[in-house]
Amino acid sequence: MNDIVRIGPGQTQQSTTKFVGISVDERERERALRERFAIFWEAVSGEPRAHYDEFISASPLVGDVDLEAVDADRVRGWWVRPRHPKPGQAILFLHGGGYVLGSAKAYRGFVSQIVSRAGIPALVVDYPLASEATLPAAPDAAKAAWRWLVAQGFDRIAVVGDSAGGGLSLVTLAELIREPVGAAPTAGVVFSPWTDLAFTGASMKDLTVADPLIGYEYLQDCARKYLGAADPHDPLASPLFGDLRGLPPLLIQVGTDERLLDDARRYADLATLAGVSVELEIFEGMHHVFQLDVAHLETSRAALDSAAQFLRNAFDGR
């Protein structure tokens, strides 16, 4: 479905919303995957960060990328590079985990799936986690990574992230429009972004939402740890409440079975009204950040193919 939204006198902006259905076989694969999720998390005890990294690391590392650790100028993380990258192009990837979990190392496999498809190198950043570090530590780290990429000579950079990292990606893009560093961002791609830490979306509290991975109470706890004394309506925490004018082209992907469904839909609507080119893809029956499950779901592979094509088009100026 293509909607033309009028922004002002003489101006129009196209917003594309695509609903992707799934087959009966894919629905069964999703059901089996949810059973495996339940078994994994029921067996978890001890340090949650180690278990989360184990869970994320199940996304397979592709064979045609190179890995390199980064620890320089306040920037820590990993390079995930294709064998033949184009000069000057890069992805800044910000991982999920509710701002309390996750690491660049654990996300290398997932990011390799994007890099291999798009042919664009990605810097996967380790940013400070809560509750040890609160807002604005994560946005500051993301902007430091952007500055580092610019200093390394990259002049075509997209920002990509999932879940909390998706929200952080949108925060980072808005900050870079407000205070530019180098060339303007090329594009943004976010998977199941957490855009509203004030929890005003209907799907967040909807008891009929069958999200197998994240619950309302869990996200509330993550938000408390991350916000510290900050207002949840602060755009540095919740990009939904920020100034969205001037953002680069955006691709937003989300599943129907998500607490964060309305976080994605409302952000897409507001960005479109602000004059941003937005592609929103909603996937039937899919759980939170289903793209990670590329080894199990055809829908995950199709979503990553779409994201890679979006990035290539943005970098090629199409």
List where the protein language model places each region.
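Alpha/beta-hydrolase superfamily serine-hydrolase fold, recognizing
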Residues: 39, 62, 66-318
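A glycine/proline-hinged amphipathic helix-loop "lid/cap" segment
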Residues: 1-83, 316-318
